[in-house]
Protein backbone atom coordinates (compact mmCIF):
# COMPACT_ATOMS: atom_id res chain seq x y z
CA UNK A 1 0.00 0.00 0.00
CA UNK A 2 2.77 2.41 0.85
CA UNK A 3 4.42 1.96 -2.54
CA UNK A 4 1.19 2.03 -4.53
CA UNK A 5 -0.49 4.92 -2.73
CA UNK A 6 2.47 6.76 -1.23
CA UNK A 7 0.81 6.82 2.18
CA UNK A 8 2.88 7.24 5.32
CA UNK A 9 3.54 4.42 7.76
CA UNK A 10 3.32 5.05 11.49
CA UNK A 11 5.39 2.67 13.61
CA UNK A 12 4.60 2.52 17.30
CA UNK A 13 6.71 1.07 20.08
CA UNK A 14 9.23 2.27 22.60
CA UNK A 15 12.02 0.50 24.41
CA UNK A 16 10.10 -2.20 26.27
CA UNK A 17 13.15 -4.11 27.49
CA UNK A 18 16.33 -2.65 28.95
CA UNK A 19 18.63 -4.57 26.60
CA UNK A 20 16.88 -3.57 23.34
CA UNK A 21 16.20 -0.42 21.39
CA UNK A 22 12.88 1.25 20.69
CA UNK A 23 10.73 -1.11 18.64
CA UNK A 24 9.64 1.65 16.24
CA UNK A 25 13.23 2.66 15.49
CA UNK A 26 14.20 -0.95 14.78
CA UNK A 27 11.20 -1.41 12.48
CA UNK A 28 12.01 1.87 10.72
CA UNK A 29 15.48 0.59 9.84
CA UNK A 30 13.93 -2.58 8.43
CA UNK A 31 11.43 -0.64 6.30
CA UNK A 32 14.15 1.66 5.00
CA UNK A 33 16.25 -1.38 4.05
CA UNK A 34 13.22 -2.56 2.06
CA UNK A 35 13.10 0.71 0.15
CA UNK A 36 10.48 2.72 2.03
CA UNK A 37 11.53 6.39 1.94
CA UNK A 38 12.47 7.75 5.36
CA UNK A 39 10.17 10.75 4.96
CA UNK A 40 7.20 8.35 4.64
CA UNK A 41 7.90 6.73 8.03
CA UNK A 42 6.53 8.26 11.23
CA UNK A 43 7.68 6.83 14.55
CA UNK A 44 6.22 6.80 18.03
CA UNK A 45 8.93 5.70 20.47
CA UNK A 46 7.50 6.47 23.93
CA UNK A 47 4.98 3.65 24.38
CA UNK A 48 5.68 0.47 26.31
CA UNK A 49 2.23 -1.14 26.13
CA UNK A 50 -0.80 -1.37 23.86
CA UNK A 51 -2.74 1.40 25.58
CA UNK A 52 0.17 3.79 25.17
CA UNK A 53 0.67 2.65 21.55
CA UNK A 54 -2.87 3.79 20.80
CA UNK A 55 -2.73 7.01 22.83
CA UNK A 56 0.59 8.27 21.44
CA UNK A 57 -0.20 7.09 17.90
CA UNK A 58 -3.55 8.91 18.00
CA UNK A 59 -1.69 12.13 18.86
CA UNK A 60 0.68 11.68 15.91
CA UNK A 61 -2.18 10.86 13.54
CA UNK A 62 -4.02 14.03 14.56
CA UNK A 63 -0.89 16.21 14.40
CA UNK A 64 -0.29 15.02 10.83
CA UNK A 65 -3.91 15.27 9.70
CA UNK A 66 -4.14 11.54 9.08
CA UNK A 67 -7.44 9.69 9.30
CA UNK A 68 -8.70 6.19 8.51
CA UNK A 69 -5.49 4.37 9.50
CA UNK A 70 -4.98 0.71 8.76
CA UNK A 71 -3.95 -1.08 11.94
CA UNK A 72 -1.50 -3.92 11.38
CA UNK A 73 -0.75 -6.21 14.32
CA UNK A 74 -0.85 -9.87 15.30
CA UNK A 75 -4.26 -11.46 14.87
CA UNK A 76 -4.42 -12.58 18.51
CA UNK A 77 -3.74 -9.00 19.61
CA UNK A 78 -6.05 -7.20 17.18
CA UNK A 79 -9.26 -7.10 19.26
CA UNK A 80 -7.57 -5.33 22.17
CA UNK A 81 -5.64 -3.01 19.87
CA UNK A 82 -8.83 -1.89 18.14
CA UNK A 83 -10.47 -1.29 21.54
CA UNK A 84 -7.56 0.90 22.61
CA UNK A 85 -7.77 2.99 19.44
CA UNK A 86 -11.55 3.34 19.86
CA UNK A 87 -10.92 4.71 23.37
CA UNK A 88 -8.72 7.34 21.75
CA UNK A 89 -11.46 8.27 19.27
CA UNK A 90 -9.67 6.73 16.30
CA UNK A 91 -11.56 4.39 13.98
CA UNK A 92 -9.03 1.97 12.51
CA UNK A 93 -9.28 -0.55 9.69
CA UNK A 94 -7.95 -3.81 11.18
CA UNK A 95 -5.46 -5.80 9.12
CA UNK A 96 -4.47 -8.81 11.26
CA UNK A 97 -1.27 -10.72 10.59
CA UNK A 98 0.73 -13.53 12.16
CA UNK A 99 -2.15 -15.96 12.56
CA UNK A 100 -1.48 -18.95 14.80
CA UNK A 101 -2.63 -21.98 12.85
CA UNK A 102 -1.86 -25.67 12.85
CA UNK A 103 0.69 -26.75 10.27
CA UNK A 104 -0.93 -30.16 9.83
CA UNK A 105 -4.60 -29.96 10.84
CA UNK A 106 -5.09 -33.73 10.64
CA UNK A 107 -5.88 -35.66 13.80
CA UNK A 108 -3.23 -38.10 14.96
CA UNK A 109 -2.96 -39.78 18.35
CA UNK A 110 0.43 -38.12 18.95
CA UNK A 111 -1.34 -34.76 19.07
CA UNK A 112 -2.86 -35.80 22.40
CA UNK A 113 0.55 -35.59 24.07
CA UNK A 114 1.21 -32.40 26.04
CA UNK A 115 3.43 -30.01 24.10
CA UNK A 116 5.32 -26.97 25.32
CA UNK A 117 4.25 -24.90 22.31
CA UNK A 118 0.58 -25.62 23.02
CA UNK A 119 0.99 -24.56 26.64
CA UNK A 120 2.64 -21.30 25.56
CA UNK A 121 -0.17 -20.65 23.07
CA UNK A 122 -2.73 -21.22 25.83
CA UNK A 123 -0.91 -18.77 28.10
CA UNK A 124 -0.92 -16.20 25.28
CA UNK A 125 -4.66 -16.64 24.74
CA UNK A 126 -5.40 -16.36 28.45
CA UNK A 127 -3.25 -13.25 28.84
CA UNK A 128 -4.80 -11.58 25.82
CA UNK A 129 -8.33 -12.44 27.00
CA UNK A 130 -7.63 -10.97 30.44
CA UNK A 131 -6.01 -7.86 28.97
CA UNK A 132 -8.96 -7.36 26.60
CA UNK A 133 -11.36 -7.64 29.56
CA UNK A 134 -9.36 -5.06 31.52
CA UNK A 135 -9.21 -2.73 28.50
CA UNK A 136 -12.94 -2.98 27.88
CA UNK A 137 -14.31 -2.84 31.42
CA UNK A 138 -11.71 -1.41 33.80
CA UNK A 139 -9.42 1.08 32.05
Task: List the model feature ranges, each with a label.
Residues 45-49, 117-124:
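Short, surface-exposed alpha-helical recognition segments that flank or form part
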Residues 121-139:
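A transmembrane-helix-recognition feature enriched in membrane-embedded lipid enzymes
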Residues 104-121, 131:
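Long helical/loop segments within the catalytic core of UDP-sugar-dependent glycosyltransferases
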Amino acid sequence: LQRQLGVPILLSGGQVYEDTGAEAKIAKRVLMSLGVPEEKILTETKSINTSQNARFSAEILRENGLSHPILVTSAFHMKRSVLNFQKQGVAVEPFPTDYLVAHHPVFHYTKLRPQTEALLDNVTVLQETLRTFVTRYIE
